[in-house]
């Protein structure tokens, strides 16, 4: 299994008494990942620009925690910086830890900070969160606004460095523009289908097809508000979005982006250790073993191989 997004590091930083990366009270830890037969887990460093006076300092603090936790449990987990590292964890049986930034604005439009983030081990950046940030407009802003000139410059630099470009939280016009700027695939790490659940955080059909045609992937988000009208996150709704993405974009576009530990905790899949329930549900819905393997890890693996 490869999961493209979780917010566990934010929770560990803000709630130090809740445990650590090996065992904690949240939905993701090493023990739970091992039960899920995890291959790669992306750990997002999420910075809410509206709640801190020093977003870059907050990023550094969370990054340091993440790197130190991975180091402390090096017999179980390894920071992956290249596809060679990915292949290494496949062979060793360790969990691969991918580190991302959720909120590109934390870098302040500074290309030197972008390069430093790469040196820090960041390999994926979610361009925006829920505020305009000097790079682009969020999903909850003006849909017609394109990326800023600085945003275009950043995206081009990310491609050159080998940092995965993530359009989750970005508005429609900015996402469409990525298709013109990039020569490599881009992703929506934790987004669903707007036609199934009308929410601006979800992707319309034309953008599902665009991401698919670029060779990109879309990680299914488990947040109940992006899935449907149920007050809890239900397996049947996740399956509905997954089947829809396959119908509109093909079986190579769909992946996992749980958003665990960043979404409301009332989820039918209680934590990462129960992910086999989702695998079984997709099989029961008619997907073949090969299609389930693509959804659970092979599509994401292909993307990592192309960009890292």
Go through each PLM region and give its residues.
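Extended, charged catalytic domains and RNA/DNA-binding interfaces, predominantly
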Residues: 1-220, 225, 243-246, 253, ...
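Soluble non-cytosolic domains of exported or imported proteins
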Residues: 24, 232, 236, 269-273
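A short, acidic, flexible beta-alpha connecting loop/helix-capping segment that sits on the rim
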Residues: 46-48, 262, 296-302
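Short, solvent-exposed loop/turn segments at secondary-structure boundaries
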Residues: 53-55, 198-201, 230-233, 266-269
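Hydrophobic, well-ordered secondary-structure segments
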Residues: 147-148, 152, 208-217, 222-239, ...
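Active-site/ligand-binding-proximal alpha/beta "capping" segment
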Residues: 233-251
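Mid-to-C-terminal alpha-helical segments outside catalytic/metal-binding sites
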Residues: 270-308
């Amino acid at each position: 299994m490869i999961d493209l997004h979780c917010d566990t590091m934010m929770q560990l930083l803000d709630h130090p008494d809740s445990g650590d990366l090996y065992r904690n009270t949240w939905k993701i830890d090493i023990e739970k990942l091992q039960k899920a037969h995890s291959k790669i887990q992306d750990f997002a460093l999420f910075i809410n620009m509206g709640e801190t006076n020093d977003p870059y300092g907050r990023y550094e603090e969370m990054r340091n925690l993440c790197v130190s936790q991975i180091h402390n449990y090096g017999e179980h987990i390894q920071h992956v910086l290249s596809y060679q590292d990915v292949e290494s964890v496949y062979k060793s049986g360790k969990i691969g830890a991918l580190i991302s930034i959720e909120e590109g604005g934390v870098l302040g439009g500074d290309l030197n900070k972008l390069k430093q983030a790469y040196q820090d081990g960041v390999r994926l950046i979610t361009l925006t969160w829920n505020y305009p940030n000097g790079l682009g407009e969020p999903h909850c802003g003006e849909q017609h606004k394109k990326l800023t000139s600085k945003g275009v410059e950043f995206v081009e630099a990310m491609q050159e460095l080998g940092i995965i470009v993530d359009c989750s939280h970005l508005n429609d016009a900015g996402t469409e523009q990525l298709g013109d700027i990039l020569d490599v695939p881009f992703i929506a790490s934790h987004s669903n289908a707007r036609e199934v659940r009308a929410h601006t955080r979800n992707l319309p059909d034309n953008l599902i097809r665009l991401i698919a045609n670029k060779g990109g992937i879309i990680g299914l988000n488990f947040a109940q508000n992006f899935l449907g009208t149920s007050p809890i996150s239900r397996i049947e709704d996740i399956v509905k979005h997954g089947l829809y993405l396959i119908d509109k974009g093909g079986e190579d576009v769909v992946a996992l982006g749980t958003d665990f530990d960043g979404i409301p905790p009332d989820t039918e899949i209680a934590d990462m250790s129960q992910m086999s329930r989702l695998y079984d549900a997709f099989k029961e819905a008619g997907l073949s073993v090969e299609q389930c393997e693509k959804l659970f890890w092979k599509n994401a693996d292909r993307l990592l191989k192309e960009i890292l």
